[in-house]
């Protein structure tokens, strides 16, 4: 055969020739390619010599034209093991790049296995053809392409249907086409390299893959590989024609006499494979007679297929499988099921276990010991070969296979089959160019989300009995047989494949070695040699330890069914048979009566967009739209006509003071006036002579904190101090970074004997061993399953009526009766005392979205918009209406100096002057007497509900109620008496297959078999001790499949199952019919702002509007003129402070005082010791309905509701607001002269009149409204301090403002003396509005008033941001203890005071960064002895004295003063890096560094500090005193204060322009600005990290690193999460102790944990050695029930406690399987005496007689007849009762009694 590459060489040579040469060469080329003989695989593998496992059979045609007989084919059985070197098939050494694979095959029905596998020299599979229900073409070239997930899978093809199929596969360029039976053609993409190379240096295996257990079984007639990709299209014409055509010379290529194709035979065929047929992609073109075989499969076959074809695991076994099989054009249901189960990597077994339709009765299947599970090589098969053929993201293999991968299989690290690790995902490819024949449909998308569960339908009538099911799945394989006798030693074979990694790790097994061992195993089996010579004697192994006793083996397999015996006489009446499986679903019942109206459903999803409607009619005139944005300024219009004169403006401000006029003539001497007010303080006099030495003054208040002094020089080394007490353990530091790998340590001593390793992967089947000796007789097996139900006896005679039985015990307490009529209201109780302020509750869950709130206050005006572009000049507008009153005019210009006025008359007595300035605060007054008794407080809150009262006496018997609804079908009645023997009936039909019988007697010993081939000698194992005799015998050979049984009788209806877990989401159903219109939906969200409507007509005048809210403060007014200097007051003499009097004797006790106001909260006490645990309280009655809580924050916006029905016509609305003025109408005609109009507005200002005579002084006007605040005037001269004014009355408390932003924390102020509480003034009546007076000038700001009366302590506010720590204050002297004053109202912030005394110890904060150690100060000189000072700081601890007697516990002392700082200790070890510390004091300015790069834009800085108070202005002139007005309402907010000083922005936060300016300022102002850039990025990074952490705390994700508290929390945070497994951490500490649970969101967010493997339950048994009435944990095989998380780990006790604290109720199911044993109610005795008893987690026994929260969902064991079960549910609000940890069984011990049970999960609902 010529090399395949010659075809390409020839093609390159063709370009240089003419058209004639081109045509000739093409014909030659065709002869050359087509003439190359196909590779006959069957011939190369020696099929015609019928090797082991291969036999000849009838082929595709039983009678072929022009042939003597039928086609010849070969039957391949499981014993066939055929392989050959690939070069034997391709002697030229090259595999064609484009090729066809042609085969005619009839696989065994339902099989899925590889027909051919080609491996390279490294053992990697390059080509594989897998046939079965969904054929797969595996291809991997030398570059590893395509990836396993891209292997072509032909889902629409089923070859394993038990029929002959002619299959042709064409591989050309990057597509692969499969043609089945010459009709069905499917094309898939094949993403391989441009020059894909297939290595021929390996081996080719037929019928399987290396290390694969699935083996091809079936018939094959032909298997060819040819280098022509077009040959696949002519397979049915030239290679395997129909039966009515004669076979070509090479049709049955397996015959030995046909060696090769004659070129002349092949060249005659005209290859008409048109482009049209080849270009179709994924389309399936087939004739009308071809049907999809898969559609006809029944459901049972589908299930069968699943069991046989367990590739991996099923993700949604019980939910995705459709329950019907149809022949319509739906997607093929079988294909869908298979795709799901075949492709996903989830754990098949765990899903099957949770399913209600279990395929296996055996409950003990799980991921650890089930034979169904994939083992190591199968897991590798899934991951390496198939993974997922859908476009789903694939999870890492260790997640996909879970426990299915053995412990020693590390898929992610060790390469599989010699592969390297997968590379990173490549970049996105170029856009595809769709060529003809290249378009491939993608796989169907994943199923849509589950729809909302519909309401349950009415129960249909019982359906007809179902058809008998197919044969059940095959049983689990038997235990492995006993080891054969050791074979003779073989030859030694050294493999140089083991090579170690680095020096620190033992030898690893390489992929090459594993592959080589497999290839050698194949070669060894295929080329079995003669027995080798005797091997070397191995060294004796160490003596093994005694093995543990083996577990008792399971019962043996049932023996073959014996011949049917003669029918005996009818036996006694049999026990009722086991409940049959549920029949098939009945036909659809008649529609039931309409049910009651259901609750309102959730808002549906938004509907599909409807068709575009017709254009609507023009709607009515809309209301005027909102004002539009400011347009661009238009050009100046034409000047309009002069407007009408406006109304007179308000009175202007006072003009500036005129210049003094000329002096008038002296007037008459006036009458002496009354003495004037006291003048202002005179100027400071000269200092007097020094006075005598005064008495020492009282101790002054501590001064303010001085600045930090410069560091002193280092002092001498002090003596080492005494060792301090050991500090409390600090919080754990953050985990450090991972250190570098250390050097390899020295070889340690040999470790102890390790545990027995996990079983290795399943080996290749060994050769048959020599038959062993006959074993000893086994022990008696366990009871077999009960026999079949006997034939039904004749009906007995009716028994006599029995006597009336004794009166039964009192039944259980009935359900709570309906509520009686409401009683008369009781007498009103006395008013309770006012309760204390409660502790704020935990934050509630966010409520549902509240109704739309009322309109908020008007917002602040927005910022000015950008200037618009210049508009077009407008037309001159119409003459406008008369404008409103103009604003108050600005202050007029200064007028001319007036003429000297005439002489004035003598003035009258002036009014009394205004009160003087407020004096300083007086000294603190004495403590007042107790006030009078206050009025009785409001009634207190209702008390807690009392304990439930004792049970009341039995009430009178009620009237007979109406007949109740039909009861449940009662249990089966007692067995009747045996009837007489009937006549012998006709032989019945064959019964259903019997349940497992007792093992048959041992057969005779067979003849000794031929000795098997010599095996390879195993390694010498250690000599084990003699094992105990095994119980289970060798498994029998697999029997032939039995015939399908006849139809079984209909079983009784099955019990109600316990509620199953929620299935996964089904596919979205079709859109249903439109429902009846629902109620009107809630108002939708506000729509987007509509476009402004057209201008409507002018509306009628609206009603008077409600008075608007107080407006915003106006801008600052213009500056006032400077006032004249006021008179100075006299200096008052301060009185001397009296000395403290002697302490008086104790007076007689006074009468008890009235209850004082609530005191200020005291200092936080230390943590108390936890008290003893209280007993579980009684279950209280339901409390009264609580007060409505505060509205929660708005919930998320719901889905768009469906449009509601049109509402009824509304009533006439109020008259709308006045519309905007309409456009000017046309000019009307000249009207007649009108009548005299009303008085016109005042005319314009007249000319200035002459100066009139001075009028008489007018009476004082009413006080005018407060004027606007003026701008601060220039600083006046400092006036003398006035006398102290009387304290003002306390103002009414203002309304509580909204909480402001956290300001920067100020320095702590000094501790002031407690002020006297001001008496609360009674609110005066609201006065009438006064007449507006002239604007008054600003008064000086008053001194802060004394503190107001104490308000009640409010709830604790939100925690403020942490401020910087204050500097340590100087020690103050100990003051005298004053009486406790009442808490004052919140005063203005005080000045900075000294640091207060030490508070109680706070909780340990986060560990800060270690600060820079300060320099040690010098030791000062001793000062002179002063007066006795306050107690000094605590000295160093003395030497420990003798231990005294324990004294009584004293009262808690006052906090002590801060001790002196001790000398510095020795430098400790370097600590872990702490959190960032507080900012240190600024250091000296360093040298200027190089300007750094611009940092990121920081957040906006804090608001600036308030500016300094402006200088006091000059005193204004005294105005006339007005009459005192009534107290007015609180005024509007004051005008804005002066702007604060701008703190220099940080360079890192400012723009470039500002930063350059700042740097220039830095150059000018030397040391003003610190370098803040260091550490800012770290701070912002920390803030961002904190923000993310807080987000995760608020909305946890349920992952291991971000767990939720409970599943309920997770549902509230993410209501769209599906049911499944999530991580929770109930105690919310470090997430390291979180654990994984199952969250059942369908049931409201339940948190479910499961019992462990040994606590799940026990199989039904008679338990002969156990006593009734004992706990299961006391049984020989019993134990306390324990529970695990989903990962199989035990749950921390603390976590369990927290989970219960967060739970409101919990539930758990318990299923009791019985045979003649009662579980709850006993029908025979009519009592609950034999009811099960459960032991709760709180050691409380629970049963029927003491726990009302236990009920039975189904009680089949009550009749004590036959096999039944009882399902018990514990649903309790007493969380400590579950999960149950033990169960007491009372009804067993008789010979026929048996029981078993299953324990369900416990689910907590928060």
UniProtKB/Swiss-Prot annotation:
<keyword id="KW-1015">Disulfide bond</keyword>
<feature type="compositionally biased region" description="Pro residues">
    <location>
        <begin position="1343"/>
        <end position="1362"/>
    </location>
</feature>
<keyword id="KW-0964">Secreted</keyword>
<feature type="domain" description="Fibrillar collagen NC1">
    <location>
        <begin position="1577"/>
        <end position="1805"/>
    </location>
</feature>
<feature type="compositionally biased region" description="Low complexity">
    <location>
        <begin position="449"/>
        <end position="461"/>
    </location>
</feature>
<feature type="compositionally biased region" description="Gly residues">
    <location>
        <begin position="541"/>
        <end position="550"/>
    </location>
</feature>
<keyword id="KW-0677">Repeat</keyword>
<feature type="propeptide" description="C-terminal propeptide">
    <location>
        <begin position="1564"/>
        <end position="1806"/>
    </location>
</feature>
<feature type="compositionally biased region" description="Low complexity">
    <location>
        <begin position="641"/>
        <end position="662"/>
    </location>
</feature>
<dbReference type="GO" id="GO:0002063">
    <property type="term" value="P:chondrocyte development"/>
</dbReference>
<dbReference type="GO" id="GO:0007605">
    <property type="term" value="P:sensory perception of sound"/>
</dbReference>
<feature type="compositionally biased region" description="Low complexity">
    <location>
        <begin position="918"/>
        <end position="927"/>
    </location>
</feature>
<feature type="compositionally biased region" description="Low complexity">
    <location>
        <begin position="717"/>
        <end position="728"/>
    </location>
</feature>
<feature type="disulfide bond">
    <location>
        <begin position="182"/>
        <end position="236"/>
    </location>
</feature>
<keyword id="KW-0176">Collagen</keyword>
<feature type="disulfide bond">
    <location>
        <begin position="1648"/>
        <end position="1803"/>
    </location>
</feature>
<dbReference type="Pfam" id="PF01410">
    <property type="entry name" value="COLFI"/>
</dbReference>
<keyword id="KW-0209">Deafness</keyword>
<feature type="disulfide bond">
    <location>
        <begin position="61"/>
        <end position="243"/>
    </location>
</feature>
<feature type="compositionally biased region" description="Low complexity">
    <location>
        <begin position="1455"/>
        <end position="1464"/>
    </location>
</feature>
<keyword id="KW-0479">Metal-binding</keyword>
<dbReference type="InterPro" id="IPR001791">
    <property type="entry name" value="Laminin_G"/>
</dbReference>
<feature type="region of interest" description="Disordered">
    <location>
        <begin position="528"/>
        <end position="1563"/>
    </location>
</feature>
<feature type="compositionally biased region" description="Pro residues">
    <location>
        <begin position="1430"/>
        <end position="1439"/>
    </location>
</feature>
<keyword id="KW-0898">Cataract</keyword>
<feature type="disulfide bond">
    <location>
        <begin position="1607"/>
        <end position="1639"/>
    </location>
</feature>
<keyword id="KW-0379">Hydroxylation</keyword>
<feature type="modified residue" description="Allysine">
    <location>
        <position position="612"/>
    </location>
</feature>
<feature type="region of interest" description="Short nonhelical segment">
    <location>
        <begin position="509"/>
        <end position="511"/>
    </location>
</feature>
<dbReference type="GO" id="GO:0006029">
    <property type="term" value="P:proteoglycan metabolic process"/>
</dbReference>
<keyword id="KW-0242">Dwarfism</keyword>
<feature type="region of interest" description="Triple-helical region (interrupted)">
    <location>
        <begin position="420"/>
        <end position="508"/>
    </location>
</feature>
<dbReference type="InterPro" id="IPR000885">
    <property type="entry name" value="Fib_collagen_C"/>
</dbReference>
<protein>
    <recommendedName>
        <fullName>Collagen alpha-1(XI) chain</fullName>
    </recommendedName>
</protein>
<feature type="binding site">
    <location>
        <position position="1625"/>
    </location>
    <ligand>
        <name>Ca(2+)</name>
    </ligand>
</feature>
<feature type="disulfide bond">
    <location>
        <begin position="1714"/>
        <end position="1757"/>
    </location>
</feature>
<feature type="region of interest" description="Disordered">
    <location>
        <begin position="439"/>
        <end position="508"/>
    </location>
</feature>
<feature type="domain" description="Collagen-like 2">
    <location>
        <begin position="532"/>
        <end position="586"/>
    </location>
</feature>
<dbReference type="InterPro" id="IPR008160">
    <property type="entry name" value="Collagen"/>
</dbReference>
<dbReference type="InterPro" id="IPR013320">
    <property type="entry name" value="ConA-like_dom_sf"/>
</dbReference>
<feature type="modified residue" description="Allysine">
    <location>
        <position position="1452"/>
    </location>
</feature>
<feature type="domain" description="Collagen-like 5">
    <location>
        <begin position="643"/>
        <end position="699"/>
    </location>
</feature>
